[in-house]
Amino acid sequence: TGDMSGEGKGMWFGPRL
């Protein structure tokens, strides 16, 4: 996913975009 984890920096809005 990467919604709040920052793993999918591009899927949602990762904190570490």
UniProtKB/Swiss-Prot annotation:
Tell me the tissue specificity: Expressed in abdominal perisympathetic organs and abdominal ganglia.
One GO cellular-component annotation of the UniProt record comes to: extracellular region
TM segment ranges: none
Question: What does the UniProt function comment say about this protein?
Answer: Myoactive.
* PROSITE patterns linked: PYROKININ (PS00539)
Q: What name appears for this protein in its UniProt entry? A: Pyrokinin-5
Alphabetical UniProt keywords: Amidation, Neuropeptide, Secreted
The similarity annotation says: Belongs to the pyrokinin family.
Q: Which GO terms describe its biological process?
A: neuropeptide signaling pathway
Sites where Leucine amide occurs are at: L17
Q: Name one GO molecular function term.
A: neuropeptide hormone activity
Subcellular location as annotated: Secreted
